């Protein structure tokens, strides 16, 4: 709306002709009232164009909305509703403890809002019953985010019983042959005579015992393996019995008492003992040839 001619008049009774707007550009003293009104209308239009225009389509979190100094009341309410809806939906659109309208309009006074559980004020104002964990299992303390199905722990899976680790036999395994006492005695007697049977001897011996050749063959194989194990056990026992209880020369001297080593040791002791300020009695030297043999286990039999 363009201003009228009465609105453009200056206060204190100053006429339009005497003001700067009424003077012509060439220094003339008079100007028509219509021209003055047109000039004032043009300047009013320029002032309105110079004012920043806020686009109604700005987002509440855009750079233009944050940098704008003047916001409309409707825009503030819309930004507040948008921020609250975003916080209720995801909880990540706005930092904790920050009022919803502070991001959209920095100079707008923020309305008081209830303190959250994780804000500083909320932690300070929580009662002691909420801070201390409930001891009774009937009423466990659970926060709202823990009650959400998104944060609920998955149900515990039941562990399946371990598989059986027993050895599985072949399905086509033949049953064990039940030998009679007479058959076992005959097989043992034949094994002591000869451990390896030829094909003809095995066929004749198996027919005499009413057994198959395969049964006689397998029995001889098992009997030879058993005899080998018994023989190895007997050899191990003989080796253990042959070993002495004490290792040789463990406690005996490995050098002769009357040898050159004893003579040299006695000579050195007498040499250094006589030269020192404190003389010590030299050890008696055994005559050469006495106890020339190495002293081993025989030293225990000396009387």
Curated annotation (Swiss-Prot):
Keyword Transcription regulation tagged: yes
BP terms from Gene Ontology: activation of meiosis; anterior/posterior pattern specification; BMP signaling pathway; bone morphogenesis; cartilage morphogenesis; cell morphogenesis; cell surface receptor signaling pathway involved in heart development; embryonic forelimb morphogenesis
GO MF annotation terms: cis-regulatory region sequence-specific DNA binding; DNA-binding transcription activator activity, RNA polymerase II-specific; DNA-binding transcription repressor activity, RNA polymerase II-specific; p53 binding; RNA polymerase II transcription regulatory region sequence-specific DNA binding; transcription cis-regulatory region binding
Ranges of compositional bias, category Low complexity: 32-44, 77-101
Post-translational modification, as annotated: Sumoylated by PIAS1, desumoylated by SENP1. Sumoylation of Lys-15 and Lys-133 not required for interaction with H1-5, transcriptional repression, inhibition of myoblast differentiation, or binding to gene promoters.
SMART domains: HOX
DNA-binding region: 172-231
InterPro entries, A to Z: HD (IPR001356), HD_metazoa (IPR020479), Homeobox_CS (IPR017970), Homeodomain-like_sf (IPR009057), Msh_Homeobox_Regulators (IPR050674)
Highest taxon of source: Eukaryota
Keyword Transmembrane among record annotations: no
Main location group: nucleus
Record's subunit section: Interacts with CREBBP/CBP, TBP and SP1; interaction with these transcription activators may inhibit autoinactivation. Interacts (via C-terminus) with PIAS1 (via N-terminus); the interaction is required for the localization of both proteins to the nuclear periphery and specific binding of MSX1 to the core enhancer region in target gene promoters. Interacts with H1-5.
Protein name: Homeobox protein MSX-1
Originating species: Callithrix jacchus (White-tufted-ear marmoset)
Lineage, broadest ranks: Eukaryota, Metazoa, Chordata, Craniata, Vertebrata
Gene behind the chain: MSX1
